[in-house]
């Protein structure tokens, strides 16, 4: 008797629970007629969330089909999940390059290294050259020359500001010959007295006015200087007489400190 009564109680309890869940899945409309709920998945997910068992965790919102208005970071904190989601966009592997293009790649890399090395070399040279004297300092440099050892009719060459300077001790015949030249026949007309401070001494820069070559002293058709590069002839006063040079030899700034002391610059 007791066993039969227990079976009847268990069957009635099961029917009551099934009736409860079946009724909860229906909604009553305005016409008082039962209607099927339009979202059975929402009801099942809601039933899963109200369970109190510790073994069942709440599923993330994106698995339940729910759209959350919370930011992704906040949603991840409120709904933690042990499922690891990899961001494939940050782990994308590029396809291997074409082997036929390796030569070009090596050429580009080698050229870049060469340009880099050249730039470093230029920077080092610029730094080293900046430690030398500037052009302003070199422009103020002067040179003192002793004239006592120069024989009449001879020419000596000294270096001043990186350029050769010709110093010629002229004889009386040289002075007469320089003053007897007709200025009308000169390409760059200039009297001998305008080019010297002492008629005995002629001081000129030893650079041809054509293309910058160094003329040879005591040579040429006029007894002065001859440029072997293109055949320019200068007379005993350093004036151009023949050849492609357009101007006379330059006269630098100089002065006599003593009778036999010359200061150039």
From Swiss-Prot:
Disulfide bond positions: 213-229
Keyword Mitochondrion (UniProt): yes
Residues reported in the UniProt entry to bind [2Fe-2S] cluster: 208, 210, 227, 230
Subcellular localization: Mitochondrion inner membrane
Superkingdom classification of source: Eukaryota
Membrane-related topology note: Single-pass membrane protein
InterPro entries: Rieske_2Fe-2S, Rieske_2Fe-2S_sf, Rieske_Fe-S_prot, Rieske_Fe-S_prot_C, Rieske_TM, Ubiquinol_cyt_c_Rdtase_Fe-S-su
EC id: 7.1.1.8
FT transit peptide: 1-53
Other known facts: The Rieske protein is a high potential 2Fe-2S protein.
Self-association state and partner proteins as the record states: Component of the ubiquinol-cytochrome c oxidoreductase (cytochrome b-c1 complex, complex III, CIII), a multisubunit enzyme composed of 3 respiratory subunits cytochrome b, cytochrome c1 and Rieske protein, 2 core protein subunits, and several low-molecular weight protein subunits. The complex exists as an obligatory dimer and forms supercomplexes (SCs) in the inner mitochondrial membrane with cytochrome c oxidase (complex IV, CIV).
Function: Component of the ubiquinol-cytochrome c oxidoreductase, a multisubunit transmembrane complex that is part of the mitochondrial electron transport chain which drives oxidative phosphorylation.
Protein name: Cytochrome b-c1 complex subunit Rieske, mitochondrial
């Amino acid at each position: 008797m007791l066993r039969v009564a227990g079976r009847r109680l268990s069957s009635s309890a099961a029917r009551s629970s099934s009736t409860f869940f079946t009724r909860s899945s229906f909604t009553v409309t305005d016409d008082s007629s039962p209607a099927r709920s339009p979202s059975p998945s929402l009801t099942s997910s809601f039933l899963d969330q109200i369970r109190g068992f510790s073994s069942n965790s709440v599923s993330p919102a994106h698995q339940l089909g729910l759209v959350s208005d919370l930011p992704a970071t906040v949603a991840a904190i409120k709904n933690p999940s042990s499922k690891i989601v990899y961001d494939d966009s940050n782990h994308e592997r590029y396809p291997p390059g074409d082997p036929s293009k390796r030569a070009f790649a090596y050429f580009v890399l080698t050229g870049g290294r060469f340009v880099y090395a050249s730039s470093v070399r230029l920077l080092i040279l610029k730094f080293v050259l900046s430690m030398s004297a500037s052009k302003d300092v070199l422009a103020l440099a002067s040179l003192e020359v002793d004239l006592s050892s120069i024989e009449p009719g001879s020419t000596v060459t000294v270096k001043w500001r990186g350029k050769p300077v010709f110093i010629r001790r002229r004889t009386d015949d040289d002075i007469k010959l320089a003053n007897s030249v007709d200025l009308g026949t000169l390409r760059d007309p200039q009297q001998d007295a305008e080019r010297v401070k002492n008629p005995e001494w002629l001081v000129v820069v030893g650079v041809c006015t054509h293309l910058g070559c160094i003329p040879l002293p005591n040579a040429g058709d006029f007894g002065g200087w001859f440029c072997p590069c293109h055949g320019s002839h200068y007379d005993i006063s350093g004036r151009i007489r023949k050849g492609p040079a357009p101007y006379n030899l330059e006269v630098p700034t100089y002065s006599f400190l003593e009778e036999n002391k010359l200061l150039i610059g």
